[in-house]
Each structure stands twice: as structure tokens, then as C-alpha cells.
């Protein structure tokens, strides 16, 4: 083939390739135009797909998925419809308590990033339950955990995480700077109450959905403090109790009515011979019942019940099955304070059912060890020590600590009644064990009208940690 023939052949091949490329490009343009015309004709059409269930990390979310045909973007989000938690239901009838959660925080914290905490509690909205806790601004098995036996410091904060999970920097949400706290959900948003500051001038900061809405200054200038468990919400209003004054003598106690984070009413209890600290409160048939700690002179628990106008009644649980720690052996009760071993105490709870009462208490009379639930069918009004049911949840050889109530509203459970639940703090470290830190994990139980079991669900961490050696 001579040079001219080669040139003609190469030119012909290039021309054919060019023509094919042009045809493909024209086809592509026509395809894009047709596709655009179809989308333009349906530009404002939005289709709603069926609900989908996504299961991840043991949590089940119900999602509504929206597909916008015009740009094919898919947006999936959890149904967060707001409802007002009525709080008008009575407590569900129950026969015992079923294990609900266990976070194993201290065990996991020996190798994982887990917060040093105390005072954990649980609160539920109509969508979820969360564990709230007071951190010490430190992680387990780290140098900053040294000295965390101290209750009040500027490093403490109220945080929360999904119930049953160990509290870590990766799953926890900051709520408030606080060394004493409470939180609850009214169906529309989270109310958090965080107290911080000096002993003689602490301030409670109220937040609603994360925004500061109100502050309450210490009125007695002697360690303003609140529940260390959930507040109670009824028909859009939430209620909490605060204490200011001596821990070993008469103090001042106030009930606050709060709507969307703003205090709308408050009263001071007329209780010269009673002592109310760290109350565990729950709604019941439109009213609020609180069972508290008498740190002054009672080994049985004081209670106060009030309506939405803050008209209140008060007294002590009459049963000879005593609920505080320290306490004497069960015996003759009193509808006022039982003075034997009445000094000091521990946060606790009870649930009233008419004249009967479920009493939660440590198994030990003198130390924060073990935990049991006792049903006394006439213990709210009678002073004998006879009881009908006892359910063990922590063995007397294992550490316990604070305990408190929380409820699951019908809007969450689908039941026609208020489900009673409780949590138990499992304290580890100082002052009882040879560590440089104090922390804890938690377990929780909910009332059921079916079979339950006696067992022990202890913290289970093997101490000391590396940092302690």
C-alpha cells in the first residue's frame, strides 16, 4: 500500500468513528430530553411509601419514607408527632417486676471509654426511654477519675443516653451543667433541671428542648437540691420538688409547677416535723405522688401527694416494713416518722395501690447492699409488718445504692394504664472499695401482671482497675 492509500484509509476510518460518535451523542441528547419531559410532567407529585421497619443496635424505629419524583431525593425520618401526656391513668395492676435494662457501665469501662457517673435515673417520653446521669467530667480508668467521691463540683453535668447502654462520649447527649438534677417529657419536649454553683448560692437552670427558659435561685443558701429522678407530667404541666436547708434537720421544701420550661406556680410545704429530700415522683389518675428520703429522723419514707393546683396531702408510709437505710428490723410502723435509726438515709421509692404499697429497699438494714421489692397489701395505712410478696433483684452480698421510680405512659406502651417501673443504682469504688474513684452502673425493672423471677443482677465489675494499682 503506497503512502496515498494509507492516508485515504486512515481518513476513512476516522470519519466513520466520528459519524458513530455523533450519532451516539444525538441519541444521548434525545434520551435526556425525553427523561426531562417525563419528570417535568410529574414535577409536583410526591408519593408516600409504606412504613418501613429498620432494626439497628437493638432499637426498632418506625419510619415514614417520602420520595420526591422530581429529583429522586429520598428522605426518611422517625415519626415524632407530639402528644400531650395526659397522666390521667391509674397504675397498671401488677404481680411482680420484670427486668427492663442493665447497662454494665463499670464492667465495660475497665477497657472502654465510659463516663464516671453517679445518680443515674430513667425517664420516658411517648417515643423512647433514656437514662439520665450526673457525670464527673471524667472517664473510668483515667487519672481524672481520682477524687470523684465528691458530690458537688464544677465538672459535673447532666447527660443522657439510650436506656440500657453504657454512658460514653459516643452515645451520650449533654443536657445541663449540674450536680443535682431532674428531667421529664410532657409529650412535646424534654424539661431538664440542673442545679450547679456554690453551696450557699446554687442556681437551678431550667431548659425546655435544650433552651434555657427559667432559673431558680437558692432561697435558703444551704445546698439547693432536687430529685435525682424524673419529674412528673400531667396534661402538659410538669411538677418537681426542691429542698433547701439542712440535711440533718428542718429544711424548706417547695413544689414547682412548670409549663414549657416556665414556672407557673410554686408553694412551700408546711412540714415542720418532716424531712423531704430526693423525692421519687409519678403521676397517678391526674395527681402526683412523691415518696422521699427523710435524712433527719425517719427510717420510714415520707410522702406528699398533690393535684395540679398544688393542693397537697402529706404523711409517712405507715408500714412496719421500713423502706430507708439505715433502718431497724421490721416491726411496729408509724404513720409519722419512725425515729429508731432514723438519721441519714438513701434515695428510694414506693408505689401506692389503695391501702397497699410496693416498697423498694436495700436488703441490708445498715449498708447500701442488695435490693428487694415487697408488697404489703395494707402498708400504706396500717402499721404491722406483714407482707405478701417479696422479690429479690440484687443479692445482699452485692452493692446497690440509690433507687427511684419512673413510669411508662399509655402513649408509649399502648396500654390503658400507667406502667410502674424503677431503677437501682449499683455504686462501685470509694468509699467502700479500694479505688481512687466512685462510679456506678444501673438496672431497671417494670411492673407486669405475669410471671417474674427472683435473682441477682449485680454490677459485676472486678476491682481494682489498672489506674488504682
Curated annotation (Swiss-Prot):
GO cellular component: host cell plasma membrane; membrane; virion membrane
Pfam families xref list: Neur (PF00064)
Active-site residue list: 151, 402
UniProt PTM comment: N-glycosylated.
Membrane topology, from the record: Single-pass type II membrane protein
Region annotation (Involved in apical transport and lipid raft association) ranges: 11-33
Gene3D superfamilies: 2.120.10.10
Parts of the chain on the Intravirion side: 1-6
Record: residues binding substrate: 118, 152, 277-278, 293, 368
A GO molecular-function annotation: exo-alpha-sialidase activity
Keyword Hydrolase: yes
Residue numbers spanned by region Hypervariable stalk region: 36-90
Glycosylation site residues: 44, 50, 58, 63, 68, 88, 146, 235, 365
Bridged cysteine pairs (disulfide): 92-417, 124-129, 184-231, 233-238, 279-292, 281-290, 318-335, 421-446
UniProt comment concerning the protein's domains: Intact N-terminus is essential for virion morphogenesis. Possesses two apical sorting signals, one in the ectodomain, which is likely to be a glycan, and the other in the transmembrane domain. The transmembrane domain also plays a role in lipid raft association.
UniProt subunit comment: Homotetramer.
Misc remark: The influenza A genome consist of 8 RNA segments. Genetic variation of hemagglutinin and/or neuraminidase genes results in the emergence of new influenza strains. The mechanism of variation can be the result of point mutations or the result of genetic reassortment between segments of two different strains.
Family assignment from sequence similarity: Belongs to the glycosyl hydrolase 34 family.
Name by which UniProt lists this protein: Neuraminidase
Organism this protein belongs to: Influenza A virus (strain A/USA:Iowa/1943 H1N1)
Amino acid at each position: 500500500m503506497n503512502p496515498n492509500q494509507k492516508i485515504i484509509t486512515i481518513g476513512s476510518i476516522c470519519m466513520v468513528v466520528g459519524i458513530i460518535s455523533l450519532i451516539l451523542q444525538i441519541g444521548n441528547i434525545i434520551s435526556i430530553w425525553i427523561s426531562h419531559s417525563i419528570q417535568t410532567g410529574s414535577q409536583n407529585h410526591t408519593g408516600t411509601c409504606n412504613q418501613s421497619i429498620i432494626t439497628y443496635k437493638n432499637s426498632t424505629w418506625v419510619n415514614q419514607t417520602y420520595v420526591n419524583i422530581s429529583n429522586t431525593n429520598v428522605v426518611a425520618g422517625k415519626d415524632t408527632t407530639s402528644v400531650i401526656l395526659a397522666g390521667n391513668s391509674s397504675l397498671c395492676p401488677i404481680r411482680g417486676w420484670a427486668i427492663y435494662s442493665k447497662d454494665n457501665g463499670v464492667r465495660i469501662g475497665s477497657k472502654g471509654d465510659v463516663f464516671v457517673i453517679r445518680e443515674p435515673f430513667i425517664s420516658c417520653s411517648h417515643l423512647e426511654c433514656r437514662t439520665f446521669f450526673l457525670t464527673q467530667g471524667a472517664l473510668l480508668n483515667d487519672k481524672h477519675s481520682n477524687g470523684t467521691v465528691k458530690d458537688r463540683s464544677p465538672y459535673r453535668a447532666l447527660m443522657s443516653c439510650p436506656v440500657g447502654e453504657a454512658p460514653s462520649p459516643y452515645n451520650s447527649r449533654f443536657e445541663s451543667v449540674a450536680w443535682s438534677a431532674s428531667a421529664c417529657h410532657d409529650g412535646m419536649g424534654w424539661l431538664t433541671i440542673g442545679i450547679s454553683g456554690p453551696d450557699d448560692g446554687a442556681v437551678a437552670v431550667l431548659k425546655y428542648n435544650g433552651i434555657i427558659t427559667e432559673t431558680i435561685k437558692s432561697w435558703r443558701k444551704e445546698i439547693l437540691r432536687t430529685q435525682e429522678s424524673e419529674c412528673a407530667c400531667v396534661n402538659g404541666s410538669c411538677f418537681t420538688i426542691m429542698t433547701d436547708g439542712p440535711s440533718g434537720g428542718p429544711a424548706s421544701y417547695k413544689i414547682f409547677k412548670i409549663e414549657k420550661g416556665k414556672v407557673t406556680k410554686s408553694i412551700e410545704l408546711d412540714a415542720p416535723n418532716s424531712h423531704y429530700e430526693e423525692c421519687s415522683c409519678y403521676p397517678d389518675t391526674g395527681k402526683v405522688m412523691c415518696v422521699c428520703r427523710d435524712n433527719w429522723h425517719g427510717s420510714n419514707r415520707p410522702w406528699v401527694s398533690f393535684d395540679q393546683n398544688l393542693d397537697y396531702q402529706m404523711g409517712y408510709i405507715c408500714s412496719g416494713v421500713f423502706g430507708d437505710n439505715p433502718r431497724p428490723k421490721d416491726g411496729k410502723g408509724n404513720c409519722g416518722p419512725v425515729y429508731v435509726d432514723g438519721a441519714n438515709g438513701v434515695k428510694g421509692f414506693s408505689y401506692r395501690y389503695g391501702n397497699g404499697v410496693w416498697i423498694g429497699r436495700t436488703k441490708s438494714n445498715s449498708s447500701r447492699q442488695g435490693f428487694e421489692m415487697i408488697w404489703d397489701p395494707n402498708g400504706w395505712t396500717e402499721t404491722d409488718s406483714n407482707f405478701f410478696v417479696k422479690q429479690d433483684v440484687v443479692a445482699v452480698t452485692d452493692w446497690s445504692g440509690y433507687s427511684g421510680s419512673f413510669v411508662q405512659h399509655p402513649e408509649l406502651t399502648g396500654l390503658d394504664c400507667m406502667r410502674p417501673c424503677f431503677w437501682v443504682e449499683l455504686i462501685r469504688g470509694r468509699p467502700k472499695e479500694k479505688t481512687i474513684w466512685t462510679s456506678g452502673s444501673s438496672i431497671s425493672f417494670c411492673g407486669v401482671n405475669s410471671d417474674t423471677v427472683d435473682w441477682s443482677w449485680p454490677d459485676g465489675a472486678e476491682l481494682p482497675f489498672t489506674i488504682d494499682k
